[in-house]
Amino acid sequence: MTLRSQGKSSLPPIIDIHIHVQPNDAIKPEALDLVRRGRRDNDDILKYARSAKEFLKFLDEAEIERAGIINYVSPDVIGYTAEVNDWVAKYCSADPRRLLAFGSVHPKYIFDAAAEVTRLKKLGIRGLKVHPSHQLFAPNEYRSGLGPLRAMYERAEELALPVMIHTGTSIFPGARNVYAQPILADDVGVDFPNLVVILAHGGRPLWMNEAFFLVRRHKNMYMDISGIPPQKVMEHFPRIEEIADKVLFGTDWPGPGVPGVKGNIEKFRALPIAPTAQQKILYDNAARLFPV
């Protein structure tokens, strides 16, 4: 049942493909401090992490039909171990139609990456997250000997499991931003042409042109616009309607610099983007990549 069918909204439905609900007690103190700094909704963030039911109410209030719940293994920068995969799978099992679980395989901390991808797929994981600047490797490092990364991409391609790659800067302590340049994902598009790749954040704020080029070049490469202030989207991507079939809406809430969800949605809807293109970005593209 959709929000529209429940009579809650006459507006087109929304999929926020990039939201962080995570086990906050596993985050490194310095990372948690950055996440919480200056926020007024920290108690709500903790409440939603403890209860998927409460988070679903939050989605209802924001008129979001489905959400990508992003988690990834990052023992060095964020603090998460492989246990985060089981956590997010269990969390999203409360409503797997509405909650799309994203987990990850860290190629530097796994022996059999392909087997782990298969396990995660069976567990209910709908997409894999690669965060180069937090996992401390380049997305194309398989070309210089990181074999488990190649195995991960190969199995994800085989199982039709989309891979979201973080692109753009990070201000978290210990992050290595050199790894997050979008152009490093060009090899992934070439070597795994049938793998769906989503460039998270569209390379913001330094490498938007690279992301735009890659999305146009590779038939299975997409990008989300999470973490970009909506009022800046047209400034950074003035030709966004040319790639409207391959852009996904996301907020990156409650990441640094993202105060809320509803405000982001309202500001995006106010942009001078054709209604048909908005519909694709807000819902259709993600619905196609992640069918119910």
Q: Regions from the language model: what does each represent?
A:
Residues 14-17, 69-70, 102-104, 197-200, ...:
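Active-site neighborhood of phospho(di)ester-bond hydrolases with catalytic His/Asp-centered motifs
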Residues 20-25, 74-77, 107-111, 134-137, ...:
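Active-site environment of divalent metal-dependent phosphoester hydrolases
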Residues 65-66, 74-171:
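Active-site gating/metal-coordination segments in enzymes
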Residues 126-127, 141-248:
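Catalytic pocket-lining loop regions of alpha/beta-barrel enzymes
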Residues 18, 59, 88, 120, ...:
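Conserved, mostly hydrophobic/aromatic
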Residues 50-56, 83-89, 113-115, 181-185, ...:
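Alpha-helical scaffolding within the catalytic cores
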Residues 1-20, 26-66, 118, 243-246, ...:
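Mid-to-C-terminal alpha-helical segments outside catalytic/metal-binding sites
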Residues 14-24, 164-167, 199-200:
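Histidine-centered catalytic micro-motifs
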